[in-house]
Amino acid sequence: MQALDRAGYSFRMVFPRLRYQISHTTFSAVFAVALYVACNALNFAKLARWFQDAGGTDYSALVAYLLAGFCLFLGFFLLFAHRYTIKPFAILLTVCSGIATYFIVKYGVAIDSSMIRNAVHTDVTEVGQLLSAQMIPYILLLVILPVAAILLADITFESPRRYLWASLKLFVLVVSIAAASLYIEYQAIFRAGNASNKYIVYSLVPVNVISGSINAASKAVKPWFKKQQKDMEFSAQVSRPGNLVVVLAVGESSRRRNFSLYGYERRKTNPELEKIAGLHLLDAVATRASTLYALPKILEKNDIMLTTVVSRAGVPTVCYVNYTLYDNCVAVGETKVSNCGHGGKCFDEDVLPLLRQDLATYKSGYRFVVLHFGGGSHGPLYRERHPPEFEQFKPPCADADVANKCSVEQLYNSYDNTILYVDHVVSQAIDALDKSGVPYVFIYLSDHGESLLEDGKLFHGVPPGVSLPAEQADIPLIVKASVPIAIDKRAVYQQPDVFDSVLNLFSIEAGPFDLEGSFIARPETVDPR
């Protein structure tokens, strides 16, 4: 706080003629109006379309919604509008809101708790890939200039009693207006929220940033305590010993419709997997389009991690990852790729040497290996997800600003190159298992798919609770085994079924799990190595 005060003082000394004095209540109101109007004006058309009915746009409901959002924002800001917090909080909101507005306008993303948590966990390299020259005007007009105006302000406060009373009166006023607005137009606003799959909520800046941050903080803390308690409450044991290595490989953003194995006709994207006999190609669906929330759908159930259950049953368990599994492997820890052979840059194939080393130590019994192919088909710079030699489909999209700098053809070329590389990595993992001679079951699936400008949508990241478009929901599920297995025929397979299937393959009995979702029949006997 003191550092910020000194920075503001120095800034005012450099630009003395631009200094201005303003009361804390006036500053709060002006700041809230300026930030709210500037950010949402850029997205107004997309918001307004959800308030249309047979007679045109329902402006009364739209105005009521926007007014309620503004009043709630101002009311929340007043809670922090104190002598030592008002400027830091205003600057923080300005920076976050400006960046959020850019991604909402340019990519149509929705800002909720999952997006906030993703932003916190995003790799530095991925952050750099999202930056482009298109962002400069947004940063200048929505961040730099407003922050300068905040630093130049000499905010005055009356006595504590008087300024608290003034804040309280304004707080009660704006909250009352918000409540009245929502009450009067409740039905119309509710319909717009449902019709838009809550888009009107997740795109209203900075209300979305504030609510998303609060929910993200809450969700980050609560599950940890719940998991710690549940981890202590259950037991797991192997009911029938055997010899089997189960390898679960989790991909990233690779959608099923671009796999030629599944009938993709644009080009052949799976030349290596097509040569492997005995593949089981299953249609699976994801229900979460954010990696942070999608991975637990595969690796967690009843707030207990799969690796925790398997390791507690006495099965040796390891996790080899490119990027991270977001704390879904804490029971045994992650082993991350390192010393990669592409000039220090790591790709998904760099996980494979770890797998080969592990298989070389296998003698007998059960073993569980989780592989994370975290590069996968993640945008926006798809060409960064594979070595240069896999850039077979040209011309690629070479810019992070996909929506403005690349054609649809370039976008598909780049994305299909990632699928070509996924094909190589998955086939090499199967090859490593075959050459090792171990009895194995190999399972590959992606955490979610990806939108490539279908209906104007790009990438992924739909908030939890909102139905996914097909291109983000439909994912590949590929199974290969060196031992006899039977797979239940289903129209579609769910990600949580993988959890049950792994436990079933190891004959693990654990109190909290009934294994009803298992789609791989447990072999009656597993031949020793």
What are these regions (language model features)?
Residues 102, 130, 313, 436, ...:
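Phosphate/oxyanion-binding loops and surfaces in catalytic or ligand/nucleic-acid-binding neighborhoods
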Residues 182-248, 253-399, 474, 495, ...:
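Active-site-proximal alpha/beta segments of enzymes that process anionic O-linked groups
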Residues 263-268, 434, 438-481:
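Histidine-centered active-site microenvironments of extracellular/periplasmic hydrolases
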Residues 196-200, 408-423, 430-431, 462-466, ...:
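Active-site rim elements
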Residues 306-315, 425-438, 480:
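A structural motif corresponding to the C-terminal end of an alpha-helix
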Residues 426, 447, 476-477, 498, ...:
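Hydrophobic, well-ordered secondary-structure elements that form the walls
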Residues 2-202:
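Transmembrane and membrane-interface helices of multi-pass
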Residues 204, 396-442:
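A long, amphipathic alpha-helix that forms part
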